[in-house]
Amino acid sequence: MTLSRRVLVGTGAGLAAGVATVAVLALTAPLGKLERSSPVVLDRHGVWLRALLVEDGRWRLRADLDRTDPIFIRRLIALEDSHFWIHPGVDPAALARAAASDLKAGRVRSGGSTLTMQLARRLEPQPRTLPAKAIEAARAVGLEARLGKRGVLAAYLTLAPYGGSLEGVRAASLAYFGHEPSTLTNAEQALLIAIPQAPELRRPDRHPLAAKRARAAVLHRLVLKGLISAKAAREAAAEPIPRRMVFPERAWAAAGELARAASPTQPTVVSTIEAPLQARLEALAAQTGAGQGEQSSVAIVVVDTATRAVRAIVSSAGRDRPGGWVDATRALRSPGSSLKPFIYAFAFEQGLAAPETKLADAPVAYAGYEPENFDRTFHGEVTAAQALQNSLNVPAVAMLAKVGPEAFQARLESTGARLVRPKAAANDPGLALALGGEGVTLRDLAMLYAALGDHGLARPLTWTQLQLRSDRAEGSRLVSAEAADQVLSILRESPPPPGRAPPALSAGAPKLAFKTGTSYGFRDAVAAGVGDGWTVVVWTGRPDGGVRPGMTGREAALPLLFQVFDVLEANAPQAQTLTPQVAPPALAQLDSRGGPQMLFPPDGASVMVDSYGPQSRGLALAARGDRLRWYVDGQPLAEADGQVVWRPEYPGFYRIAAVDDHGRHATARVRIK
């Protein structure tokens, strides 16, 4: 074999080995980063509650092509990779031009990278060298084979760098514009195309002038390609550069738990929480905490009694306050007297007493344990109902002695609730349970009270819409329906807080069954209530367990409980106050040649609906005009049986439009309550 032939063979073998090595690298392009995206928790209607960073400290939100502005996608491809839909991952012509430029310069300085090659680089960054470029090209071909075009595009839009900790078009759109990228303005699209080319140098929050120049350059290129008019480009270029917004963190503690439990394959969790209700109660908690002193905190749990869906959960009065990062809904705190209703319920069920049974409120001792009432007085003979309504301690301890403290605790814990005794004294037979001698979480207390509200049937709380839709167990019987209903009937006649009318004088108002609790040393103030389909438990106290002299459940927690029910009542769907389903005949005869005219709902209206979503009766929209098409916030509505019925998904403001065949339209901005 001649020398030249040996050289050729050696060169060919080396080239083959190189190609094989590159091929292996392409086939093993790591997808781990793509599989790790930020878990996002939404409210029941899809409103953002909270997201978490991925392990490497990035906001990485998985992109959805079907929910990304298609015009933005077309413009991105036109400017960044015009042959995207036809090349195999590498654009040979662009790569050849870039290679020639790079060889001439002796280093990588020119582009030529397709979106797929950029994706390969994002998945595993390589040094900017010619061999690294070859690896990226080979991996791009492999990625195309593995993911397909739509998969590659979705992956690129998930990992594209947008400065700082932001990755992907969703994170950037939410951080800079405050909304999902489903609909983007010309200015927003241009900025999202410009930033990834130099993400740190073009960060709008740190380098607004550079971001503005880069956006203008993209707009100019769009004009040259005929993808936008010069006038529209000038208008977009004149818009201010946005600043970075803080991501929402509603229901921060509970949403954080749900996010951490999310599956890597399903990083989005739709919770049962109502975002508008959550926001109102967080504000109420902050106001209440401020009114009770700098060291005080507040917690609230709101449960839909029928489904056990947690509709709102407030963990503190604010994380900017002392101890504000402590989730008080999970902390073991003394329930005070708030477990007394269950003592009486078990006693009624077992025939040990009835609501009108006479009980002695007098001094008594149990192996050295001598309970006394909160007011340090005894009231003689009282009925069981009176003892419960006035939270008398001595009769409650007597009832617990008959029921048996161990049996009482076992019955409560059979629901999944956990009662923890801090330190049992030698002379304490467990009767202190009646007065809050064992700790319980606010979440478990809500579960127990929801069982009372559901005729004695216990079920765990529900946190996600997926759980709500799935088949659920029948639940467990905590107490008989008759006993549970008797206890609630008694509690409905309890003395209301100052400033509230007694139940007998509030005909027509929802009847609220409630009980308060105050722990030893005024450390915890608790109030729990059941009424109008809701179970609510509130707590106020110091996160560090400190004493708050005079802050009882009745004084510190009960007013808050009633305020929460006020919010729930104000939030409740009412009968529709505007109900014309079709245009009156006289109006229907009017000439419509002047364009559509909105008839129902009128502009500026506030409309009460019976419920939200598919179960709602809906609103029949009406307008004067011919061959109308209807839109709500830009989304088309379908016509059925000659009518267009709109079923709002959640309360808030909406823009309704009716458009005729000539493009003329009538609009109404309405508020749904």
State where each predicted segment sits.
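Juxtamembrane regions of bacterial inner-membrane/periplasmic proteins
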Residues: M1-E294, T305-R311, S316, A362, ...
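Active-site SXXK
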Residues: L76-I77, D81, L222, L281, ...
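Soluble, non-transmembrane domains of envelope/secretory-pathway proteins that act on or interact
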Residues: M1-T11, V19-A23, T28, I228, ...
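Active-site loop and adjoining helix of the penicillin-binding protein/serine DD-peptidase-beta-lactamase fold
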Residues: P196-A214, T265-L277, D320-D361, A365, ...
